[in-house]
C-alpha cells in the first residue's frame, strides 16, 4: 500500500494511474479470480471473456461503506473486492469520511473482506493495492509560507482524518514535489513503463525464488 503526498500539480494522480502499467500482467489464476468476482457482481458482459488487465478503481470521496466493502440484501462485492489483484486509488484521501477510511483496516491487513448478515458471514477476496493521494494541508501548499495560509490547527485537523491504524498499514510513503513549467519544457529521456515493468517482474521472480517451498510468496506477505 502506498501514500503519495504533495502540492497540487505535482503529479500524484498521474503516478497512481501509471501503476497498473508497471505491475506484472495477471497470471491465469489471478485472471480467473478477477473475472469470477466481476461475474458474481453482475459487471461482466454476457459474451465477455477472461479479464486480463489489472483493475484500477478510483471512487469519489463520498462513496458509501456498502459500495466500498460490499453488502446488500443479497451480498455483492464492493470496490475493495472489485479491485482484487489491482489498484484502488483514493484521491484527496483526507476528504473521505474517517469512518469510511477505517473500514480499510481489515482488508488491507487480511487481503479479504468479511460481511456479516443475518443469514451468515460472506467472505470476498480483497488483495488490492490501496494507493492514497493527499495534499500536505487544506490549501495544498504547506510548507511554502508564501502560498500557504493554513493555521497549525487547520493542518492538524486535516491530517487527523486519517487514523493511525490506517497509516500503520501503509508500506510506502512518497513525497511528490511541484514541478516548475521550465522543468516540464526541458526534454529529458525518462524510463518507460515497459522498462519499469521488466524490473518489477525481475524483483518479483527473485522473491518467489527466495520464498519457494513456504506459504509466503512475497515480502509483503510477511506478518
PLM regions with names:
Residues 2-46, 110:
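Walker A/P-loop
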Residues 6, 70, 92:
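The Walker A (P-loop) glycine that initiates the GxxxxGKT/S ATP-binding motif of P-loop NTPases
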Residues 7-8, 46-51, 212-221:
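Short coil/turn segments at secondary-structure boundaries
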Residues 10-12, 25, 61-62, 74, ...:
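Short flexible coil/turn linkers enriched for glycine and charged/polar residues
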Residues 49-50, 54-55, 60-88, 121:
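Conserved alpha-helical scaffold flanking the Walker A/P-loop in AAA+ ATPase domains
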Residues 75, 98-103, 107-223:
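Basic, amphipathic alpha-helical bundle interface domains used for macromolecular binding and assembly
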Residues 85, 91-93, 103:
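Walker B catalytic acidic pair
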Amino acid at each position: 500500500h502506498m501514500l503519495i503526498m504533495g502540492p497540487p500539480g505535482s503529479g500524484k494522480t498521474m503516478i497512481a494511474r501509471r501503476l497498473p502499467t508497471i505491475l506484472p500482467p495477471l497470471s491465469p489464476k489471478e485472471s480467473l479470480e478477477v473475472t469470477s468476482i466481476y461475474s458474481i457482481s453482475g459487471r461482466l458482459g454476457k459474451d465477455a471473456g477472461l479479464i486480463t488487465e489489472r483493475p484500477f478503481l478510483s471512487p469519489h470521496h463520498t462513496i458509501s461503506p456498502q459500495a466500498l466493502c460490499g453488502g446488500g440484501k443479497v451480498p455483492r462485492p464492493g470496490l475493495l473486492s472489485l479491485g482484487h489483484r489491482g489498484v484502488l486509488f483514493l484521491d484527496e484521501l483526507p476528504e473521505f469520511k474517517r469512518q469510511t477510511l477505517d473500514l480499510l483496516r481489515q482488508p488491507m491487513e487480511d487481503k479479504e473482506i468479511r460481511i456479516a448478515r443475518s443469514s451468515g458471514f460472506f467472505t470476498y477476496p480483497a488483495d488490492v493495492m490501496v494507493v492514497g493521494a493527499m495534499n500536505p494541508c487544506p490549501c495544498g501548499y504547506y510548507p511554502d509560507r508564501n502560498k500557504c495560509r493554513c493555521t497549525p490547527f487547520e493542518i492538524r485537523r486535516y491530517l487527523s482524518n486519517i487514523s493511525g491504524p490506517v497509516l500503520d498499514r501503509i508500506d510506502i510513503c512518497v513525497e511528490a514535489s511541484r514541478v516548475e513549467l521550465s522543468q516540464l519544457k526541458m526534454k529529458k529521456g525518462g524510463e518507460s513503463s515497459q522498462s519499469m515493468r521488466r524490473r518489477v517482474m525481475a524483483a518479483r521472480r527473485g522473491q518467489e525464488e527466495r520464498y519457494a517451498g513456504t506459504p509466503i510468496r512475497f515480502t509483503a506477505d510477511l506478518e
